[in-house]
UniProtKB/Swiss-Prot annotation:
The lineage of its organism: Bacteria, Bacillati, Bacillota, Bacilli, Bacillales. GO terms for biological process: D-amino acid catabolic process. Homodimer. Belongs to the DTD family. Keywords: Cytoplasm, Hydrolase, RNA-binding, tRNA-binding. It comes from Staphylococcus saprophyticus subsp. saprophyticus (strain ATCC 15305 / DSM 20229 / NCIMB 8711 / NCTC 7292 / S-41). It comes from the Bacteria. GO terms for molecular function: D-tyrosyl-tRNA(Tyr) deacylase activity; Gly-tRNA(Ala) deacylase activity; Ser(Gly)-tRNA(Ala) hydrolase activity; tRNA binding. This is D-aminoacyl-tRNA deacylase. The gene is dtd.
């Protein structure tokens, strides 16, 4: 499982059936790979919720999402598993099938919510307009395999 975490001042996602917006928090771009498991969900959710990516009074990255009462906008993004080694068109054979990926994506969001975080989402498997006001910018890529951060 591969997740791009962006600290944001605000972020939104819209399409024909979704219109969600958060203020201060994280915008997550969530990729589910063929080998992603429930262990990866638990590992990454805990790591992201506890990540100290917000500045304290001294300007150090020392505060986590809960300490700043932040929110999460979670966006599914199968293109995070693009293979660009051959040719000019990316391949997506390392992305999990949509049905299975959606199930793990929903479990991931539910796990984040279990920490008391307000989590809004886009619509899985559709084209969406995502507006991100990256704060800093602070952008971190998290990846887990077999329940371990890699």
């Amino acid at each position: 499982m591969r997740i791009v975490v962006q600290r944001v001042k605000h972020a939104s996602v819209t399409n024909d059936s979704v219109d969600n917006k958060i203020n201060k928090g994280y915008c997550l771009l969530v990729g589910v790979g063929k080998s992603s498991t429930e262990a990866d969900i638990a590992t990454l959710a805990k790591k992201i919720v506890n990540a100290r990516l917000f500045e304290d009074a001294d300007g150090k990255l020392n505060l986590n999402l809960q300490q700043v009462e932040g929110e999460i906008l979670s966006i599914s993004q199968f293109t995070l598993y693009a293979d660009v080694r051959k040719g000019n068109r990316p391949g997506f054979t390392q992305s999990m099938s949509p049905d299975c990926a959606n199930e793990l994506y929903e479990q991931f969001n539910d796990t984040l919510r279990s920490y008391g975080i307000n989590v809004l989402t886009g619509e899985f498997g559709t084209d969406m307009l995502v507006d991100i006001a990256n704060d800093g910018p602070v952008t971190i890529i998290y990846e887990s395999q077999d329940g371990k951060i890699i």
